[in-house]
Amino acid sequence: MVPSTFSRLKAARCLPVVLAALIFAGCGTHTPDQSTAYMQGTAQADSAFYLQQMQQSSDDTRINWQLLAIRALVKEGKTGQAVELFNQLPQELNDSQRREKTLLAAEIKLAQKDFAGAQNLLAKITPADLEQNQQARYWQAKIDASQGRPSIDLLRALIAQEPLLGAKEKQQNIDATWQALSSMTQEQANTLVINADENILQGWLDLQRVWFDNRNDPDMMKAGIADWQKRYPNNPGAKMLPTQLVNVKAFKPASTNKIALLLPLNGQAAVFGRTIQQGFEAAKNIGTQPVAAQVAAAPAADVAEQPQPQTADGVASPAQASVSDLTGDQPAAQPVPVSAPATSTAAVSAPANPSAELKIYDTSSQPLSQILSQVQQDGASIVVGPLLKNNVEELLKSNTPLNVLALNQPENIENRVNICYFALSPEDEARDAARHIRDQGKQAPLVLIPRSALGDRVANAFAQEWQKLGGGTVLQQKFGSTSELRAGVNGGSGIALTGSPITPRATTDSGMTTNNPTLQTTPTDDQFTNNGGRVDAVYIVATPGEIAFIKPMIAMRNGSQSGATLYASSRSAQGTAGPDFRLEMEGLQYSEIPMLAGGNLPLMQQALSAVNNDYSLARMYAMGVDAWSLANHFSQMRQVQGFEINGNTGSLTANPDCVINRKLSWLQYQQGQVVPAS
């Protein structure tokens, strides 16, 4: 028998070994906390991974995985799930988790399009308290909350973010910085006030000044950029130029020695094609000069005795033609011109070139594919046209290598390095109206449109542009025929300033909404509902006969003190307006092309003479003239951001897709006169 003393000694000696084994066994099965690496941004995964880790963890580690899952869900566009998980976060968080929660709340607000809510949350965060990867997200949230509206705060956010980014992201940041700078007007830029130690911002503003001074002269612009890079060698933009300015340095002018003009010369659209051809050939032979965008006030002459337009090819004007794929319903006869032009600020002209070879191709006589093949064989250096929308769609499918100034635009714009789009359409006019009304400080617009496809297109274009400019909900109200309007006047019903919200087709995103009460988007001051008293601007798209009923009906229902300013498209103005009509339209603002607003009286007289005083066709004539200017500056429009031509159809600039934007003249009826809108 073994002595009991020996057994106790042996057991005592074995105990440390057993305990050590148990300890090491426990260490072997324990998984270290990996959430920290993910929180710091040194590792990344998708939401499914984070959710799985969250289910398998507890305490602070579980909260970290939960925060990571929320961040991933927002990034993946699963906003509803992100909100649900966000609202399950516990109240007790450490400082690091609390900062992450606040940042996530702002990012969710941005995903929900609640920009004001996001800005309020971001104001509670001190960037210096954040980790480096959180700082990059914070500045990006500040940038997104600005909605692209240029401001000193946006510039500061972009500059603060730049050092935190990788090479690819740096280029995007620099391009965004330049986009903000080049989107400002010179007046906006002159009001900026910066601190003495903001050297990088000062450098950017000096580059902006170079651009303002030289944007219509590519050679001077190249020299100015090179000089700026020498003066600011440490500026991020000097080390890595904005893409738009790289394009300027690589600028080469396009040739217009051999031009192909693609137009419909037969059928209902022939009257438009031949009128554009007339304007184009006139400009080719005599050249063009800058046109005043704004004019001085003058009494409107009574032109009721003007001869009426004569019918050409069975169609008196674009308004009478059933050509749905051209530019939609065309405006009727247009307003009395006011006084002489003021001095132009964008001194860009297109010289005459009578010797340039011009060949006309009839798009109504053969398929566009055959025409393009022939154009290429003929050696054209640039194509102007086609005019009809369906032909522009065919043009894109052809993948032609030729430089093309299309005289319309497709439903879905495609960015092609060799194509620009120049259209005169009601949608284009509606976008300009949105910009004009927004510039006048209005917040709550109502669009009053005909019950038709035209009305739907105009409403969608206006709402898209309004929201792009940072506005909220736009209301719409539709009206019927002239006989229905007459009945409304006789019945004394009037028109209430109410309507239903427009949801722009291109911006609908059902994945960005949520019914969760904690982080649900709530309407801001400019995201109103159909409260008639809140409407402060009404944009009317109507014929002269329709607006003659509509304006009195608005006054009948709302009184003269409704507080809403009335605006109209050029469709509602008329070249033969007498004093009674002008007095009836008192206070109404309407848009017009500069040529017919008095910005180029000699050309207006020439155009009206050529089209038998049809103001609608005179617009197409002006389009032909401007097409010559654009063809001569095709490379500048395509490559030089901010290049501007003060044309007869508007102040012409191009967006990044080379869609030509037209800033129109705005006029107003005042005591029987037509004057510039204030």
From Swiss-Prot:
Q: Write out the biased-composition intervals (Low complexity).
A: 300-310, 330-340, 513-528
Q: Which gene encodes it?
A: lpoA
Sites of N-palmitoyl cysteine lipid attachment are: C27
* Stored CDD domains: PBP1_YraM_LppC_lipoprotein-like (cd06339)
Q: Which family does it belong to?
A: Belongs to the LpoA family.
Does the entry annotate any disulfide bonds, and if so which pairs? none
What's its job? Regulator of peptidoglycan synthesis that is essential for the function of penicillin-binding protein 1A (PBP1a).
Q: Where is the lipid attached (S-diacylglycerol cysteine)?
A: C27
> Which branch of life, at top level?
Bacteria
| InterPro entries for this protein | LpoA, Lytic_TGlycosylase_superhlx_U, Peripla_BP_I, TPR-like_helical_dom_sf
Q: What is this protein called?
A: Penicillin-binding protein activator LpoA
Per the UniProt entry, the signal peptide is 1-26
Assembly with partners or alone: Interacts with PBP1a.
Keywords linked to the UniProt accession: Cell outer membrane, Cell shape, Lipoprotein, Membrane, Palmitate, Peptidoglycan synthesis, Signal
Gene Ontology CC, one term: periplasmic space
Alphabetized Pfam families for the sequence: LppC
Q: Which GO terms describe its molecular function?
A: enzyme regulator activity; hydrolase activity, hydrolyzing O-glycosyl compounds
Where is the protein found, in the record's own terms?
A: Cell outer membrane
Mind listing the GO biological process terms from this record? peptidoglycan biosynthetic process; regulation of cell shape
